[in-house]
Amino acid sequence: MASSKLREPVDEVFDLDLAVPETTRLDSSLHKARAQLLAKGRRHRPSRSRLRDSASSAEDGEGSDGPGGKVTDGCGSPLHRLRSPLHSGPGSPASGSFCLEPPGLRRSLDEDEPPPSPLARYRPLHNAASHEGLAATSGSPPRSAPSSDSSPSFVRRYPRAEPHSEDDSRDASPPEPASPTIGLDKKTRRKFLDLGVTLRRASTSRSRKEKGSNRLSMGSRESVEGSGRTGSSPFLPFSWFTDSGKGSASSGSTTSPTCSPKHEGFSPKKSASQESTLSDDSTPPSSSPKIPGGPRQETKCSYPYHTLSQSSDEFLDESLPAVQHWTSQQVGQWLHSLNLEQYAAEFAARQVDGPQLLQLDGSKLKSLGLSNSHDRALVKRKLKELAAAAEKERKAQEKTAKQREKLRRRENDAKKS
């Protein structure tokens, strides 16, 4: 009696079904199907031995009517169709199934069904314009028999025909008739992308040729642009220096890109003493005031670039001392460059040359007809610039003369020693 009394409360305590009622288990088939689908996407491309094994196992397995059975095409070769649980169901159509074909075999539906259009097998893929690129390549009609170019042995024998890594072969490429075709919806494609699996289209030989031609055209365009840039370059070739010293007729043609007509018209005449010195031998175009010039020199440009030992400041202001040697005609050209051509006749009548121009002040300018204060201020400012540049050039000439003297002394000392 005592033992039966003890058993009753124990049974009541351990009978948990009364406290926690039984519930239906959660449906995890969707998660399992996703895991299987992701695992299938990472599999290697089936080889010939695997195809034979799968064919023999399918013959020994279930009948041809089951979803995992074999379907024979017109040639009698077994063709396996695996359906994903994602799309399988009592009311799901056969076109939405997940189909995996081995290479070298042609997929065919039941004999009573008409052959589908090339876009019909991509119903799960089509989601507006997101898969437009994949559908465009599938527009080629399926061939009746697979060619030898698409077989795996051809790919192994000629690796240059499709130079892609093994990852490319595992990607879901657009449907070649002999390549495995995987129909993926938008959510599954996003899963693949999250896992780092690339779903890109294998490039054909035509696209590679187009890329190569584009690269060639880009290179030729760059070379043409580079030649155009060198043609208009401000730097001169070495043949210019040699021809200009000889005074040959070809120097005029070689210096045509660099000698601008503005500064050629304003280049001053040079005396024999200027030709003998190095600093007076060139008049570059980049000086701040515009310098008038005399008759145009034909065989020689007015600013050859062979004053390499000078500094940049000396090089820019090299032609400014020529104002001391200006004639009245060059003074008139200088006034034209300042848009003061209305006073050029009075300056020419008074025979104002370069040295007289540097000595002009306010009263002399008024006597020359410059009644406008703005014009007088402009002329004074330009004259100050000319005078400052002339002084600077004089100091630069003295400096170069001292450097030459030092070099001569060093050469003499080296010869004596």
Curated annotation (Swiss-Prot):
Residues 36-302, 390-417 are annotated as: Disordered. Gene3D superfamilies: Transcription Factor, Ets-1. The keyword Membrane does not apply. Keywords: Coiled coil, Phosphoprotein. Residues 159-173 have a biased composition (Basic and acidic residues). Transmembrane segments: none annotated. The modification Phosphothreonine is found at residue 283. The keyword Phosphoprotein applies. Residues 375-416 form a coiled coil. InterPro entries: Neurabin-like, SAM, SAM/pointed_sf. Residues 326-389 form the SAM domain. Residues 40-49 have a biased composition (Basic residues). It holds the Pfam family SAM_2. Residues 138-153, 244-260, 276-289 have a biased composition (Low complexity). The modification Phosphoserine is found at residues 84, 108, 173, 179, 279. This is Sterile alpha motif domain-containing protein 14. The gene is Samd14.
